[in-house]
């Protein structure tokens, strides 16, 4: 177990394939968390409690959140308010996975033509990292593609309060 793990990650390639998360599973989970429609067959094939379950469900209101970030950075390129907060219960029960989202906030900022971000995770199991980094990369890419000019994904400052090997 590592407490307060942090790392800067270049986001020009955010695909980390593993046996648990082959490329298609990564794409399905990211699409789902971006609020896109996915088939029931894909849900059956790829979704499981071990792969993140409800702790990894970040999609609530995601379309509006993405639009808000794009509007914020378009009107105010140096804004400190380009933040996506993942919904959490204000009075969480420690026994509820729904109340314990792993990803808590992502702060976005422009540095020239690069869209950078800082992500705060409550917890990260190393074997689930490929799914989370793929989603964050897809989210940064989606926002960058909707900004004026040739904005590209830049650097992610990744912070996890606790890093463990697996979900056991």
Residues of each region from the PLM?
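Terminal, non-catalytic protein-protein interaction segments that mediate quaternary/complex assembly
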Residues: 1-168
């Amino acid at each position: 177990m590592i407490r307060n793990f942090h790392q800067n990650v270049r986001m020009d390639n955010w695909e980390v394939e593993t046996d648990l998360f082959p490329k298609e599973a990564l794409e399905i989970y990211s699409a789902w968390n971006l609020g896109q429609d996915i088939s029931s067959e894909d849900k059956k094939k790829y979704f499981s409690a071990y792969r993140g379950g409800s702790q990894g469900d970040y999609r609530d209101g995601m379309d509006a959140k993405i639009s808000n970030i794009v509007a914020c950075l378009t009107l105010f390129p140096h804004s400190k308010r380009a933040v996506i907060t993942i919904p959490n219960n204000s009075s969480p029960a420690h026994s509820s996975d729904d109340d314990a989202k792993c990803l808590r906030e992502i702060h976005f900022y422009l540095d020239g033509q690069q869209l950078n971000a800082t992500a705060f995770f409550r917890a990260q199991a190393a074997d689930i990292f490929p799914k989370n980094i793929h989603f964050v990369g897809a989210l940064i890419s989606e926002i960058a593609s909707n900004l004026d000019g040739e904005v590209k994904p830049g650097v992610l400052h990744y912070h996890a309060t606790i890093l463990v090997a697996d979900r056991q």
